[in-house]
């Protein structure tokens, strides 16, 4: 009887261990599912964050005015149209909305080593000043009388000749003879500075004279 009772109770002791194993496997599966969901959620949040930053960056760049737009505003009501003529006679035009890599002077970096380069600058406004920078301005004359077109011949630091054709009207008081070379402009600035110093010395001398005259009385 005791052996039969012992054999009958033995399966009852095995059953709880199997149930514990099943519960443990279920818990592990739930934890793995939760962890995978958390990783997916973090990945989605990171993608949304990166996409928001990139969208804001594109929006800021779209709102920022371009250099071409600023140049158009400074040029006036009409656009600035530039044409380049090389030695072969071919011409190329560049508009403010184009993708040509030219600056305000219309100099193409690809043709900077050419012997000569002729440029036409069409301005719908008034030419206020003509400045050559390091280039020495040699000549300015009318291409044809009455057509408001002026040709400026300039020589660069590398002894290359450049001719600029300006279409427009010169302001009042500015003619062909009033445009001087950089050397003449430097001399004029020196002369004005010396005249200003002379006037300051005279004013100081007069002030000292009046002060001395007042102290004597």
Curated annotation (Swiss-Prot):
<dbReference type="InterPro" id="IPR003102">
    <property type="entry name" value="CREB1-like_pKID"/>
</dbReference>
<keyword id="KW-0238">DNA-binding</keyword>
<feature type="region of interest" description="Disordered">
    <location>
        <begin position="73"/>
        <end position="109"/>
    </location>
</feature>
<dbReference type="GO" id="GO:0005634">
    <property type="term" value="C:nucleus"/>
</dbReference>
<dbReference type="InterPro" id="IPR001630">
    <property type="entry name" value="Leuzip_CREB"/>
</dbReference>
<comment type="function">
    <text>This protein binds the cAMP response element (CRE), a sequence present in many viral and cellular promoters. Could regulate the transcriptional activity of genes involved in regeneration processes.</text>
</comment>
<dbReference type="InterPro" id="IPR004827">
    <property type="entry name" value="bZIP"/>
</dbReference>
<comment type="subunit">
    <text>Binds DNA as a dimer.</text>
</comment>
<dbReference type="GO" id="GO:0000981">
    <property type="term" value="F:DNA-binding transcription factor activity, RNA polymerase II-specific"/>
</dbReference>
<dbReference type="Pfam" id="PF02173">
    <property type="entry name" value="pKID"/>
</dbReference>
<keyword id="KW-0539">Nucleus</keyword>
<feature type="region of interest" description="Basic motif">
    <location>
        <begin position="191"/>
        <end position="211"/>
    </location>
</feature>
<keyword id="KW-0804">Transcription</keyword>
<dbReference type="GO" id="GO:0000978">
    <property type="term" value="F:RNA polymerase II cis-regulatory region sequence-specific DNA binding"/>
</dbReference>
<comment type="similarity">
    <text>Belongs to the bZIP family.</text>
</comment>
<protein>
    <recommendedName>
        <fullName>Cyclic AMP-responsive element-binding protein</fullName>
    </recommendedName>
</protein>
<feature type="domain" description="KID">
    <location>
        <begin position="34"/>
        <end position="93"/>
    </location>
</feature>
<dbReference type="GO" id="GO:0005667">
    <property type="term" value="C:transcription regulator complex"/>
</dbReference>
<keyword id="KW-0805">Transcription regulation</keyword>
<feature type="compositionally biased region" description="Low complexity">
    <location>
        <begin position="89"/>
        <end position="109"/>
    </location>
</feature>
């Amino acid at each position: 009887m005791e052996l039969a009772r012992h054999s009958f109770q033995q399966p009852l002791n095995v059953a709880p261990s199997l149930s514990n194993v099943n519960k443990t496997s279920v818990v592990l599966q739930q934890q793995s599912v939760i962890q995978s969901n958390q990783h997916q959620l973090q990945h989605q949040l990171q993608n949304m964050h990166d996409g928001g930053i990139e969208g804001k960056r594109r929006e800021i760049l779209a709102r920022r005015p371009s250099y071409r737009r600023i140049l158009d505003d400074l040029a006036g009501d009409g656009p600035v149209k530039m044409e380049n003529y090389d030695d072969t006679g071919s011409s190329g035009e560049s508009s403010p909305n184009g993708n040509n890599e030219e600056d305000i002077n219309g100099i193409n970096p690809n043709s900077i080593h050419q012997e000569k380069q002729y440029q036409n600058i069409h301005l719908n406004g008034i030419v206020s000043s003509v400045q050559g920078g390091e280039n020495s301005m040699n000549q300015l004359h009318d291409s044809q009388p009455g057509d408001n077109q002026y040709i400026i011949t300039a020589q660069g630091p590398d002894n290359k000749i450049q001719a600029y054709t300006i279409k427009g009207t010169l302001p009042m008081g500015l003619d062909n003879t009033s445009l001087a070379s950089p050397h003449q402009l430097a001399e004029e600035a020196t002369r004005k500075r010396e005249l200003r110093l002379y006037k300051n010395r005279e004013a100081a001398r007069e002030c000292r004279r009046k002060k001395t005259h007042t102290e004597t009385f």
